[in-house]
Amino acid sequence: MSHPQQRFFVAGVKQFLPSYFSGRSVIEIGSLNLNGSVREFFQDCNYLGLDVGEGPDVDLVCHGENYGGAANSTDVVISCEAMEHNPQWKKTWLNTLRLVKEDGLVVMTCATPGRRQHGTVEFNPSDSPLTIGKSQNYYRNLAACDFTDLLQHDAWFSVWGFFEDRSSHDLYFFGVGKEASEEARTQALQLHAALKDHYHKVNVLGHY
């Protein structure tokens, strides 16, 4: 489910890494358009939106952990505000890393500790209608350590980072692959520094 802080993060990634948002192959995991879609950030791309049921901006009904595309075949894999609703988020994350090219980009946003439960039978089921429709009544706020305990991200990415926005209780990730160009690595390092500074201002100085 789209919201301003999450869209700000994706826009920031695009600002610093624009080449990944035009003329590329893209897979979005959890692509249902509820109140806005990250699809609009991409231009002239071969775009495939996956979700667990039919709906706006869903191109293929498929669980993210089950999508069997070729390994190292996709320029960008993106998932926004979906992992917290996915009981198989670990397998989905591993499949994300399997799918992305060695010089590709991964972008992920999800809820982190402090966010109120949503998209369940008990709390705001309309926030995740496809999982509710599949009787998948699951929710978990995720922290960076949940992902870093799963695997060593340095094995996949030359530049990467998790960032937390405590104003919205969001967790954000971006990473560019080990074979990314020198230009992309430089841009990614600049992005990492800018995000670190921004979320220090938000989380520590209260600038939001």
Where in this protein do the model-derived segments appear?
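Class I SAM-dependent methyltransferase Rossmann-like catalytic core
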Residues: 1-20
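S-adenosyl-L-methionine-dependent methyltransferase catalytic module, highlighting the catalytic core
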Residues: 87-101, 105-208
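Conserved SAM-binding loop
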Residues: 15, 21-116
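Intrinsic disorder/low-structure terminal segments
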Residues: 8, 20, 40-41, 146, ...
